[in-house]
Amino acid sequence: MPLVRYRKVAILGYRSVGKTSLAHQFVEGEFLEGYDPTVENTYSKTVTLGKDEFHLHLVDTAGQDEYSILPYSLIIGVHGYVLVYSVNSLRSFQIVKNLYQKLHEGHGKTRLSVLLVGNKADLSPEREVQAVEGKKLAESWGAMFMESSARDNQLTQDVFIKVIQEIARVENSYGRQDRRCYLM
């Protein structure tokens, strides 16, 4: 019988970058056409990786900006983060830098389990952020990077598989993440 591990993952980013679309595509297997701003939603899905099962609890947040204050509910008890920007919005890329800084400070400047995602790769002709810029930013954080398209279901499953792998990588390099001390 496989070991079941619970993982809480917060999805953060500027408004209209496709956070809800990524989560919905992953869990429900369909793209949401209309845009209805999210206040906060949760999604759950169980994923099997190797011999282990992971019960993912996804927290789909409202769009943040540089003035947003991250609540402690997005710091305490969260195992990993998917920071999302839109490849056709330089502003969303700048906001994701601020969000990472706030998370980093909220966690006491310890290493975080973060996956940086350039979403809306299907809008590449309107691109304002090159993939190399996303990769460079993620490397500066010691994080993983990928691009995806919730609309085309391009690498949507991989986003959440990679964040599970990133959580394991960080836990293995620093010991169990849930043993950390949180500063409030």
From Swiss-Prot:
Main location: membrane
GO-annotated biological processes: TOR signaling
CDD domains per UniProt: RheB (cd04137)
GO cellular component terms attached to this protein's record: cytoplasm; endomembrane system; membrane
UniProt cross-references to InterPro entries, sorted A to Z: P-loop_NTPase, Small_GTP-bd, Small_GTPase, Small_GTPase_Ras-type
Top-level EC class: hydrolase
Reaction(s) the record says it catalyses: GTP + H2O = GDP + phosphate + H(+)
Propeptide span(s): 182-184
UniProt superkingdom: Eukaryota
GO molecular function, one term: GTPase activity
Family according to the record: Belongs to the small GTPase superfamily. Rheb family.
Role summary: Binds GTP and exhibits intrinsic GTPase activity. May activate NF-kappa-B-mediated gene transcription. Promotes signal transduction through MTOR, activates RPS6KB1, and is a downstream target of the small GTPase-activating proteins TSC1 and TSC2.
Name of protein: GTPase RhebL1
